[in-house]
UniProtKB/Swiss-Prot annotation:
One of its GO terms (cellular component) is cytosol. InterPro entries: Phosphoglycerate_kinase (IPR001576), Phosphoglycerate_kinase_N (IPR015824), Phosphoglycerate_kinase_sf (IPR036043). Keywords: ATP-binding, Cytoplasm, Glycolysis, Kinase, Nucleotide-binding, Transferase. It comes from the Bacteria. The keyword Transferase applies. This is Phosphoglycerate kinase. Monomer. It is found in: Cytoplasm. Its EC number is 2.7.2.3. Belongs to the phosphoglycerate kinase family.
């Protein structure tokens, strides 16, 4: 992989367009978690230190493309930046696509990229407009690196210089460290509701990790190979595929589970073995024996890859499995990497972000990188380097 890095370029007094990932949860104009903003700051701060003219763009949520929707405006991010960079002039508008004049060390935040018609289908005219704003394009949104859109991919065809920001490089380096030459033993914890969405990830990780621990609806599909699991969430169409994986690799499934009769917040949990689950019961978390076994595996590991909760952690009585796994990873001296939307929510819930070696900002991009897919944004950076170096 040959790409330019922002750290290698002279960006002083240059117009720098940074594609950040500022897709944070916002309710009633209040930012609920600033994790992605904090991850984006080092690249922005470096550009300011180098006296670049800094333009920032990002998407937020899923508005109807081409239309302004207040709920999805980046205005709360603008307010956040004003406090963070209180000695810096910061501009915010939806009209910057026609050009903006900045002095070195100033910032312009563009409005939500998805308010621009053509963003999602990688429109060439829009991509060209983005490229006209800058001398150098910095791709720093790992969380959107798997999307072939104008602001993440199309711009690379027109801009003279495209490079990777600090966050994108750190994401790639951390994933390579876990996947290429992991310290052993390596354990991968894969939770979530569907085997179908993570089958390729499981298949790839099974060939790399010494042990795979499955949780959530994914584990239920593996349990359904041998047991009747009541009304638990699982995928009947993937039971055969799950069996092929289990028979070939070291995949750990729960030996006991917390079950309930109703999927609701205050439902009482009963611990049962998989051969004792009734028709009107559903699995919603690991049981104590499973937790004990899994803690032992994690404690002995030197590399830990974690994607997804192992139970319905939003319900207090079905939180223990996810909580104990999260805290065991946090207390481990192993190299740990965590990624995926719900995983970040768990990390926030138990306040362990400073105890994980690397927390990926990517969801889909995180999974596709693990699968071995070439992410469109990285492909764009490679092509830009190759074509503009001739």
């Amino acid at each position: 992989m040959t790409i330019r890095k922002m750290t290698e370029l002279n960006i002083t007094e240059k117009r720098i367009l940074i594609r950040s990932d500022l897709n944070v949860p916002i309710e009633n104009g209040i930012i609920q978690s600033d994790a992605r903003i904090l991850a984006a700051l080092p690249t922005i701060e470096l550009a300011l230190q180098k006296k670049a003219k800094v333009i920032i763009m990002s998407h937020l949520g899923r508005p109807k493309e081409g239309y302004y929707t207040k709920k999805y405006s980046l205005f709360p991010i603008f307010e956040y930046f004003k406090k963070k960079f209180n000695n810096t002039k910061i501009y915010f508008s939806n009209n910057f696509l026609d050009g903006i004049k900045l002095n070195p060390g100033e910032i312009a935040l563009l409005e939500n990229t998805r308010f621009n018609k053509g963003e999602l289908n990688n429109d060439e005219q829009l991509s060209k407009k983005y490229s006209d704003l800058c001398d150098i394009f910095v791709m720093d949104a790992f969380g959107s690196a798997h999307r072939m859109q104008s602001s993440t991919y199309g711009i690379g065809k027109f801009v003279k210089i495209a490079c990777a920001g600090l966050l994108l490089i750190s994401e790639i380096d951390a994933l390579k460290k876990a996947l290429k030459k992991p310290k052993r033993p390596m354990v991968a914890i894969v939770g979530g509701s569907k085997v179908s969405t993570k089958f390729n990830v499981l298949n790839k990780l099974s060939k790399i990790a010494d042990t795979i621990i499955v949780g959530g609806g994914i584990a239920n599909t593996f349990l359904a190979i041998d047991y009747k699991i009541g009304k638990s969430l699982y995928e009947p169409d993937f039971v055969f595929e799950a069996k092929k994986l289990r028979d070939k690799y070291n995949i750990i499934v729960p030996i006991d589970s917390r079950v309930g009769k109703n999927f609701c917040k205050n439902e009482q949990a009963i611990i049962k073995s998989p051969d004792n689950i009734k028709e009107d019961e559903e699995i919603m978390d690991f049981g104590d024996e499973s937790i004990k076994k899994i803690i032992s595996i994690i404690t002995q590991s030197q590399t830990i890859m974690w994607n997804g909760p192992v139970g319905v952690f939003e319900f207090p009585n079905f939180r223990k499995g996810t909580e104990m796994i999260a805290k065991t990873i946090a207390n481990s001296n192993a190299f740990s990497i965590a990624g995926g939307g719900d995983t970040l929510s768990v990390i926030d819930m138990f306040n362990i972000k400073n105890n994980i070696s690397y927390i990926s900002t990517g969801g889909g991009a995180f999974l596709e990188f693990i699968e071995g897919k070439k992410l469109p944004a990285i492909q764009m950076l490679e092509e830009n380097f190759k074509n503009k170096s001739k």
